[in-house]
Amino acid sequence: MSYSELYTRYTRVWIPDPDEVWRSAELTKDYKEGDKSLQLRLEDDTILEYPVDVQNNQVPFLRNPDILVGENDLTALSHLHEPAVLHNLKVRFLESNHIYTYCGIVLVAINPYEQLPIYGQDVIYAYSGQNMGDMDPHIFAVAEEAYKQMARDEKNQSIIVSGESGAGKTVSAKYAMRYFATVGGSASDTNIEEKVLASSPIMEAIGNAKTTRNDNSSRFGKFIEIGFDKKYHIIGANMRTYLLEKSRVVFQADDERNYHIFYQLCAAASLPEFKELALTCAEDFFYTAHGGNTTIEGVNDADDFEKTRQALTLLGVRDSHQISIFKIIASILHLGSVEIQSERDGDSCSISPQDEHLSNFCSLLGIEHSQMEHWLCHRKLVTTSETYVKTMSLQQVVNARDALAKHIYAQLFSWIVEHINKALHTSHKQHSFIGVLDIYGFETFEINSFEQFCINYANEKLQQQFNSHVFKLEQEEYMKEQIPWTLIDFYDNQPCIDLIEAKLGILDLLDEECKVPKGTDQNWAQKLYERHSNSQHFQKPRMSNTAFIVNHFADKVEYLSDGFLEKNRDTVYEEQINILKASKFPLVADLFHDDKDSAPATNTAKNRSSSKINVRSSRPLIKVPNKEHKKSVGYQFRTSLNLLMETLNATTPHYVRCIKPNDEKLPFHFDPKRAVQQLRACGVLETIRISAAGYPSRWTYHDFFNRYRVLMKKRELTNTDKKNICKSVLESLIKDPDKFQFGRTKIFFRAGQVAYLEKLRADKFREATIMIQKSVRGWLQRVKYRRLRAATLSLQRFCRGYLARRLAEHLRRTRAAIVFQKQYRMLKARRAYRRVCRATVIIQSFTRAMFVRRNYRQVLMEHKATIIQKYARGWMARKRFLRERDAAIVIQCAFRRLKARQELKALKIEARSAEHLKRLNVGMENKVVQLQRKIDDQNKEFKTLSEQLSAVTSSHAVEVEKLKKELAHYQQNQEADTSLQLQEEVQSLRTELQKAHSERRVLEDAHNKENGELRKRVADLEHENALLKDEKEYLNNQILCQSKAESSQSSVEENLLMKKELEEERSRYQNLVKEYSQLEQRYENLRDEQTPGHRKNPSNQSSLESDSNYPSISTSEIGDTEDALQQVEEIGIEKAAMDMTVFLKLQKRVRELEQERKKLQAQLEKGQQDSKKGQVEQQNNGLDVDQDADIAYNSLKRQELESENKKLKNDLNELRKAVADQAMQDNSTHSSPDSYSLLLNQLKLANEELEVRKEEVLILRTQIMNADQRRLSGKNMEPNINARTSWPNSEKHVDQEDAIEAYHGVCQTNRLLEAQLQAQSLEHEEEVEHLKAQVEALKEEMDKQQQTFCQTLLLSPEAQVEFGVQQEISRLTNENLDFKELVEKLEKNERKLKKQLKIYMKKVQDLEAAQALAQSDRRHHELTRQVTVQRKEKDFQGMLEYHKEDEALLIRNLVTDLKPQMLSGTVPCLPAYILYMCIRHADYTNDDLKVHSLLSSTINGIKKVLKKHNDDFEMTSFWLSNTCRFLHCLKQYSGDEGFMTQNTAKQNEHCLKNFDLTEYRQVLSDLSIQIYQQLIKIAEGLLQPMIVSAMLENESIQGLSGVRPTGYRKRSSSMVDGENSYCLEAIVRQMNSFHTVLCDQGLDPEIILQVFKQLFYMINAVTLNNLLLRKDACSWSTGMQLRYNISQLEEWLRGKNLHQSGAVQTMEPLIQAAQLLQLKKKTHEDAEAICSLCTSLSTQQIVKILNLYTPLNEFEERVTVSFIRTIQAQLQERNDPQQLLLDSKHVFPVLFPYNPSALTMDSIHIPACLNLEFLNEV
């Protein structure tokens, strides 16, 4: 393509600039062949003539279209060159605040110098499992790519992080390791991932330091291998270090620091455990005060030191070793501060024996003070014949001291690294690893020494490996697409590497010079000049003979040779090392041990540090103290680097290049000069150049067709094959066939071709735009002319009409004036005439009226005089009549009073007489007579029988007569005594009763009197209050309106707050349940990992039963504690503690219920004991078994009736008291008379029922006593009399027994009457007390009202009104509340009484029926002994009976092996109903163990099924519905009133009778929560792969989303073949499947709503998180697609009647994000609209979307930085969370509302498919 085609008008180019490196310009005219310059317009409108040389290709770089600016991947740019890369990085960094950008396989990371919220757990989970090209560039994306390739390809991976000091290498490596620790968490409980992360603060403390470029610069290189097992869980790690900068220990440049650990230790020197270190502040030590700045802004060294100690502890470093480490570090500081004094001769030095620092140094290391003092100033020379000790000069001593300090620190550094590796080592077999290389980047300073040379040498090796890997990937891509491939020429830095490491290279010559005894840096430099002066990569500086220049891949670097030899030798005198070996501290001696020193530095298994120095003698007999180590530093580094390269070559590398944007560490400040230097040094531009040499732009045929179809002709579009269309179009558009290639699935373009196509597309649009503008302008002019012509005609028409209307108006006015004059004159004359007539009539009327009134007054006076006379005469006659009548009444009253006194006296005399008592006892005597008659009748029968049998019983006749006489005599005596006693008791009781009646009358009179006075006072007060009622009502209305508004607002706020607190509390509880289930699963996993074999359980129950070992309430508290202890023994302390927590919460309620039940239970046990005792006696005495059972049953029923009667009486007393209280309130307030009378009626009815029940109890007692007497009489019979001779005596005994029985009945009746009299007197006393209490209450109320009235009189009228209104309001409020409480209490008592009465009546009926049946059985026992009675089959009562041994079979058939498909077509939740019917039968039989065992087995069986089918949605939903239904059944039939409101009478009969299963309801509720969470997890796992593809990528609206130039070029390693692409219909189908399954399983509708609310939240979270992390998805068309997809989901919710679930509200953030993408983003009003609309999005999310927003074409403007700043300013007031992404793992707390079933238990039938034939219906 010619230059004239490329450089046309409006084309934008890049030109060099001294300040900004590159500057943008625009051509103002086309370039023509032969032109020597281009006319350009700069951005500031400056016109510039830019010279060009087409022959030498010296033309400005072309600028990419705006549509490509801001791309995620630099290789996606059409024009690939330095200015394009720099500009793209600048735009992303400054305008969008994106610090990560891809450059092919390289991740470019720019240090923002600011904490960004993009590294949280939510971001990690968002990138987990995603393809590298699908998400925005991030270090987590690179880590995920490495993890994914390791798992898929089973090949080791490596991440190489490089860059300048301060560029963020350490932070990037740290975040990569954090990602691996999160997604690859260890399966066992070793916490290896925590240890890997804990190694970072340790290595930062001992290996990082503050430099001029970075406050936390790593001064060593490290390679961390993170090991994984076959399941790709972290099992261990290993660290290798390279080239520690030891010189920093003894020297720091200005404004730099030593290693952090020194300053941290000084900051913590005040701690008690560090007093022996003798440390002070860092400024006091020579080695820490070199740089002049000992602090770092924003860094607390003391806190960092504490973190370092915690990390050492976590990694297993003992406290003693930690103290030893800190002693060694402190000794280095003291060593550097030792004062060395030079002698006069200058050749020797000395150290003062009193030097405090030297003493501290020796004491901290445990060495001899004198020896170290001597050998610091002397050295030993060994020859073949003798040994010399030589003094050293001051400089030599300082160098030796510094060398010793560096060596000590290096050894300590190696020891710490070795122990970290031991802590991270694992015994498990490592399957694969991911290595993270954090190594120094290319460095160049004003003065470059040995360290910079080694660093740049390492970067040369890494760059060579990088180039070969990039080249290989490019070649693989071309081969995959089956296009021709030619070798690309790329930079090969092997010659530079050979210059450094080849034989006789720089390092080889350096080692040779180090071996020379008197070798110098100058001699070495001269050898370099001589050997390599002809090399292209080596140069000699013009002005220096001690420096040399190496031409590296990034830049030319000049090295100063001074110090190279000394640093390469790293000499330490052996005498000093020997002193350290003799230390009394084991750690110090171990650091310098011979075995340790002799180990090779390259041994990766034992020594991972590249800075290892060997100190040993050359010969075993003659020690040479000055002999240097055999292996120099350069050799060691070269060896370790080769090993590293071997490791990296055996892995798949991933590259992260860190860029430092500025040297001032300013946040989000970009310096182009510094950035370009680093881009050139780190290989990014080399990657660009390799890509540009081939075909960097790649398009799929589909995307190319959609993007450039505007360039196609109509006839070309007739072809249906898009691939052929693209080929024909490209051949016509681009003439040079070398500029593009057709691959198998993509089209490959040379650099610049996509930009050319974009230019053609833009030209096409520009031409179309011009055509449209021309047509529109012509149309507008025509419309304008037509509008003007129509306006002119209209104006003329209106003018003519106006003139005609004005003439007509003038004529009308003239005619109207004449009419007005005529009418006015006529009106004036008529008014004058009417005035005269009206005056005449008025005068006549007044005159006539005067005469009429005068006559009327005279007649009226005569009439009134007559009336007065009539009334006076009548009054006189009435007065006389009344006086006579009063006199007659007085006489009559006196006579009647006299007669009444006489009658009273007679009544008193009669009351004292015995006749009265006899009349009272008439009824009693009648009963006695009846009993006597009965006795006489029986005697007659007895006499008749005795006469018939006299022949046989003549010998006993005399005895019988004697017994009869004695019996008669005894009866007479007893009756006489009893009658006298009863008469005396009745007389005393009547006296007391009369006395109580008289007192009651007195109190009633006093009460009536006081009540009358109070009513009068109340009437007066009400009269006064009546005056204030109107004003009160007005004020009340105002107050009510205000209070209503305030209360509504406050109630809404309180409701919201309470709902929020409830949700939080429920969420916390369910999270605890979830954690509990996780701990349970973890426990099972640990148990499974144990050595397999038979393990004996400590109890007879299985281990699974212990999981839900909850006792029922019928057991004692001791049993509960024993069960809890058994749980601790069976399942461990942790789990039992959690179970005990739930148990203790419920135990409080259990105790309260047990206190109430203990009394009844004690009575029951007593009755049972009596019954058992009676049975034993019956067996011993040979009595009938049936008769004894009846007696025991009657005794039990009697006790129950007595207890219930007492309870009923107490309830009636409470009801009476409540009624009396309400009556008192009614008397004081004169309100609610109807309710009072209603309650009295209810009380009367209750009393009547109580009396009836008392009579029934009396009858029952009599019958029971008769049975007892019969049994006692049977026991007293003579056992030795034979049957023939004893029968007559038996008859006699029966006769006597009847008499005694009748006597006891009379006594019992008398006692009953006495009890009734006592009860009545007590009732009267209680009534008197109530009346007194009422009087007192009325008095207090009167006093309060009087005080209130007095206070009111003292106030002003306005205040009185206000005070009165307030008092009235408070009074009415209190009364209303009291009435409500009373009504609720009465209603509750009424329900309770009715229920108890019903139960009482039923039990009485049962007792009567049972007794009648027993008597009938006894009567017909002999007749029916040989007859077989066939029992009629009873109705099904809704219970299922099973044997204990069938429990396992029941659980297996009904739970473990049950498939949901087996129950299709049956009642939903059938297993739950069957289980409840089994529980009900166990309750019916009062079998506590059976209930407990069945419930425990059921719960554990469900858990086992769910664990087995942990990914089966249908099975999980099946058991969720059954567990919830089982829980509802336990509530519905528990007997609690709150759960029985919707039950039918039949259902109430199915309630549990003996057990309270409240604890098990809580266990089932927790199990339901666990099942629900598992259900949500399964559903989310099925939905999540569809969400991103369906919601963001699929085109729901065809043709809406335009295609823009591709972003990241997805590598073949990043993609999985055959990736699924989902559409919205797939989500809808999956939702339909979920809904169908849930409905078929009979799950409660409320739970179904919550399930879909959770699923829609997950859809919202995943979609929004991906939207926030994908630049290609943030466009206007994506917003339209999203809104359409959401509307389809909302329509589905409405179609399924799920729109009330709150699911739509969970989608609100996504809805607002879609609207944000579609809104205008230009003006201030647009910003306000966005802020008001996007209330569910946080500030960070809004800003992130705006930064990511990308136009689809160049005609749409980008969002400006100023607009984003405006949005941020307006949203500053928001208190938004700092989290960018939504928590996709969040689960709403589930609520299981009570949902009773309408089915009755007796209507449920068991299908045969369940194989439950062993269950028996009861």
Swiss-Prot record:
The modification Phosphoserine is found at S1416. Its main location: cytoplasm. Residues 641-663 are annotated as: Actin-binding. The keyword Transmembrane helix does not apply. It is found in: Cytoplasm. GO terms for biological process: endosomal transport; modulation of chemical synaptic transmission; protein transmembrane transport. One of its GO terms (molecular function) is calmodulin binding. SMART domains: DIL, IQ, MYSc. Residues 1140-1261, 1313-1415 form a coiled coil. Residues 69-762 form the Myosin motor domain. Residues 8-60 form the Myosin N-terminal SH3-like domain. Residues 1098-1118 have a biased composition (Polar residues). Residues 765-794, 788-817, 813-842, 836-865, 861-890, 884-913 form the IQ domain. Keywords: Actin-binding, ATP-binding, Calmodulin-binding, Coiled coil, Cytoplasm, Motor protein, Myosin, Nucleotide-binding, Phosphoprotein, Protein transport, Repeat, Transport. GO terms for cellular component: apical cortex; brush border; myosin complex; Schaffer collateral - CA1 synapse. The keyword ATP-binding applies. ATP binds at G163, E164, S165, G166, A167, G168, K169, T170. Residues 1086-1120, 1161-1188 are annotated as: Disordered. Residues 21-40 are annotated as: Requires for interaction with LIMA1. InterPro entries: Dilute_dom, IQ_motif_EF-hand-BS, Kinesin_motor_dom_sf, Myo5b_CBD, Myosin_head_motor_dom-like, Myosin_N, MYSc_Myo5, P-loop_NTPase. PANTHER family: MYOSIN, UNCONVENTIONAL MYOSIN-VB. Component of the CART complex, at least composed of ACTN4, HGS/HRS, MYO5B and TRIM3. Interacts with RAB11FIP2. Interacts with RAB11A and RAB8A. Found in a complex with CFTR and RAB11A. Interacts with NPC1L1. Interacts with LIMA1. Belongs to the TRAFAC class myosin-kinesin ATPase superfamily. Myosin family. May be involved in vesicular trafficking via its association with the CART complex. The CART complex is necessary for efficient transferrin receptor recycling but not for EGFR degradation. Required in a complex with RAB11A and RAB11FIP2 for the transport of NPC1L1 to the plasma membrane. Together with RAB11A participates in CFTR trafficking to the plasma membrane and TF (transferrin) recycling in nonpolarized cells. Together with RAB11A and RAB8A participates in epithelial cell polarization. Together with RAB25 regulates transcytosis. This is Unconventional myosin-Vb. The gene is Myo5b.
